[in-house]
Amino acid sequence: MKYDVIAYCWNDALAGFTREDAQRLTHVNLAFGLIKDGLLDLHLLKYLHLLPKLREWNPEMKIVLSVGGWGADGFSDMAMTEEGRRNFAKSCLDAVEKYNLDGIDIDWEYPCNDAAGIGADPRDKENFTALLATLREYLGKDRIVSLSLIHI
């Protein structure tokens, strides 16, 4: 049986990534992109210029951008409308193409629940589903759309 070995890599850890790290993994999820004004915001990710080196070390490794994380606001408002979902998905596609990423991972903590101190709405559940469908539409069937979740 073949297993995937997936690691979340925080921005600063990317600077210390080694050839051995890259060769151990099938996937690396870069943490975290955020949402600002309804669009993908990469200002925290200062080491994206190192991604070609990771690809050189392990050409088969999938590199996925994780968006969100604990306390990351903006999902509920962005996903509330079709226009918001489309604008966000387009900004994700732009980043995927610019940085040669293999996909987007959504870490929305938590739809319908403001436990993390972020905006939430009872409609988040269906809007989350619509967001994932929109991401799939924009990224296409050959790119990764994944999510980190508990129960919704």
Residue ranges and their predicted role:
Residues 1-96, 112-113, 123-126, 134:
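Glycan-recognition patch characteristic of GH18 chitinases/ENGases
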Residues 6, 146-148:
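Soluble periplasmic/extracytoplasmic beta-strand elements of cell-envelope proteins
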Residues 24, 100-102, 141:
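Short loop/turn motifs at secondary-structure junctions
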Residues 28, 104-106:
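Hydrophobic residues within beta-strands of alpha/beta enzymes
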Residues 117:
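Catalytic palm subdomain of template-directed nucleic-acid polymerases
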Residues 125-143:
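Active-site neighborhood of glycoside hydrolase catalytic domains
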Residues 150-152:
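Conserved small/polar residues in nucleotide/adenosyl-binding loops
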